[in-house]
UniProtKB/Swiss-Prot annotation:
Keywords: Amino-acid biosynthesis, Arginine biosynthesis, ATP-binding, Cytoplasm, Ligase, Nucleotide-binding
The species this protein was found in: Geobacter sp. (strain M21)
Subunit and partners: Homotetramer.
Gene3D superfamilies xrefs: Argininosuccinate synthetase, chain A, domain 2, HUPs, Single helix bin
Pathway terms, separated by semicolons: Amino-acid biosynthesis; L-arginine biosynthesis; L-arginine from L-ornithine and carbamoyl phosphate: step 2/3
Annotated residues for binding of L-citrulline: Y90, S95, N126, R130, S179, S188, E264, Y276
Chain sites annotated for binding L-aspartate: T122, N126, D127
Catalysed reaction equations from the record: L-citrulline + L-aspartate + ATP = 2-(N(omega)-L-arginino)succinate + AMP + diphosphate + H(+)
Residues at which ATP binds: A12, Y13, S14, G15, G16, L17, D18, T19, S20, A39, G120
Protein name: Argininosuccinate synthase
GO BP terms in the entry: argininosuccinate metabolic process; L-arginine biosynthetic process; urea cycle
Family stated for the protein in its record: Belongs to the argininosuccinate synthase family. Type 1 subfamily.
Subcellular location, record wording: Cytoplasm
Keyword Nucleotide-binding in record: yes
Length: 406
């Protein structure tokens, strides 16, 4: 669709430098109505000033929606039922937020009669893929305006100059030479000084967590209860999904839990450094795996575990709404029906360790079979036949090699 044909755009708007400039640029270049949408995913910032800034910068209408409960309940928790983790370290805090933002953006586009959507993701990053795959899931014919792939504002200074020319009220500072993105699950840092892969991230960068060496000298124990793979209570107190994750963030942050420094493989093909704080998510994943250990069948667990890398890649690469992810989610959720129980964790100076787990309804741990003491239910002599049968292929191969070498 040509610029002149676009009549109304809904923009995913944060109020930061990039999206404020994009808002003005859309008004100048497309000459159409622009509706902004800002999602409250637990950034910790007051979003009402964003409304005023959007109107001052040219927005015709502003949406600000509180999506915290939906974010944790319908996106974070399903992902955590799978124990998803990307490249062994990243708990996908940014990746899982984009599908929800795009979903609500497309709902607003339909409500407002918009014929185009826009976002502030750069042409080098993962987010452009995540947003646009979701857009096309909801409306295959939607027009996507991606300014970073159109304009010539290809440097930070060019953006600042554009902002000054257009009287966009944006504070410019060099005190924090990196970019960040925050929601209830995590906060991410990238760019700027972090592009030096040898440089240790400065301590003043971190927001959610204490440095482990300055965390309390006394460990804290926390008990997390699960029902069908979802956390429902902490230390016996039931909470909503968003309340629970926020509470774990506070506890984990106090003990320096959940810092990760990762050089990851982006979906567009390049490597990029990301530094993350995920205190509550780190605790939640450890607790979930502990309850699974006592409630989940071995072969079910091993099959599910073999699929975790693929499932995590789907989320990282923007395929949350794909049929393969939805199919896999059905299988994962089936495996979680027995994941009911409580995990007990010990938090101490950056470490989160399971020290106990129990399940009153679904425990597969049977002391009569597992004990190292004398028992009446397991005949240890039976192990001989089991071993001989399982070693048959190894013995045959050994005999074959011996005959071959004669």
């Amino acid at each position: 669709m040509a610029k002149k044909e676009v009549k109304k755009i809904v923009l995913a708007y944060s109020g930061g430098l990039d999206t404020s400039i994009i808002l003005k640029w859309l008004k100048n270049e497309y000459g159409c109505e622009v509706v902004t949408f800002s999602a409250d995913l637990g950034q910790g910032d007051e979003l009402e000033p964003v409304r005023e800034k959007a109107f001052k910068t040219g927005a015709d209408k502003v949406y600000i929606d509180d999506l915290r409960e939906e974010f944790v309940r319908d996106f974070v928790f399903p992902m955590f039922r799978a124990n998803a983790i990307y490249e062994g370290s990243y708990l996908l805090g940014t990746s899982i937020a984009r599908p929800l933002i795009a979903k609500r953006q497309m709902e607003i586009a339909q409500i407002e009669g918009c014929d185009a959507v826009s976002h502030g993701a750069t042409g080098k990053g993962n987010d452009q893929v995540r947003f646009e795959l979701a857009y096309y899931h909801f409306n295959p014919g939607i027009t996507v305006v991606a300014p970073w792939r159109e304009w010539k504002l290809n440097s930070r200074q060019a953006l600042i100059n554009y902002a000054k020319r257009n009287d966009i009220p944006i504070p410019i500072t060099k005190k924090r030479p990196w970019s960040s993105d925050r929601n209830l699950l995590h906060i991410s840092f990238e760019g700027g000084i972090l592009e030096d892969t040898w440089l240790e991230p400065p301590e003043n960068m971190f927001v959610l967590t204490k440095p482990p060496e300055k965390a309390p000298n006394k460990p804290q124990y926390v008990e997390i209860e699960f029902e069908k793979g979802n956390a429902v209570a902490v230390d016996g107190v039931r909470m909503s999904p968003a309340e629970l994750l926020a509470h774990l963030n506070t506890i984990g942050g106090e003990h320096g839990i959940g810092r990760v420094d990762l050089l990851e493989n982006r979906s567009v093909g390049m490597k990029s450094r990301g530094v993350y704080e995920t205190p509550g998510g780190t605790i939640l994943r450890e607790a979930h795996m502990a309850v699974e250990q006592i409630t989940m069948d071995r072969e079910v667990m091993h099959l599910r575990d073999s699929l975790i890398p693929r499932y995590a890649e789907m989320i990282y690469n923007g395929y949350w709404f794909s049929p393969e992810r939805e199919m896999m989610q059905c299988m994962i959720d089936e495996s979680q029906k027995t994941v009911n129980g409580v995990a007990r964790l010990k938090l101490y100076k950056g470490h989160c360790r399971t020290v106990g787990r129990k399940s009153e309804s679904d425990s597969l741990f049977n002391l009569d079979f597992a004990t190292f003491e004398k028992d009446q239910v397991y005949n240890q002599a039976d192990a001989e036949g089991f071993i001989k049968l399982n070693s048959l292929r190894l013995r045959i191969r050994s005999l074959m090699l011996a005959n071959k070498n004669k």
